Amino acid sequence: MTFRSWVVDKDNQDYYGGDQDWFPDEWARRAGCASVCAADMACFYEHKLDISYPDFLELMTKMFKLNTPGIMGFPYFYKFAKNFKKYMKHIGLDVEPIYQKITESPEQGVHLVKTAIDQGHPIGMLILTHEAQILEEETWHCMCITGYE
């Protein structure tokens, strides 16, 4: 299941969500994944399902200021959630994050994802380490999950 999501129109092409490579600043391109995740989630909750590239980049930049990464990136999911909630309240929306620091089993993780998606909520996920080869390039990375198969 995947819910209707936002589309970023950049150079007459549609993109499903943002890309940290769009940041003009090199550091943001390297370490701005939490900012892109937050911008993706904000678009969903604000019902901005079609957004221009300049507007999305502006939102990414706002989120970068809220979630400025340090030398190790931004591996602080409680702080991420607090900052996101604060931003949403500032624009008049109330969200309540649900935290799952560690799952006891893969099945528990799948259940968490499916439940959130089925209830219409995107998931901001931070993967610091993982044993799965398929996720090798995605460690120490934040992403927005909007569906499952």
PLM regions with names:
Residues 1-79:
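Active-site-adjacent structural segments surrounding the nucleophilic cysteine of cysteine proteases
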Residues 2-7, 60-149:
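Conserved active-site-adjacent core of cysteine acyl-enzyme catalytic domains
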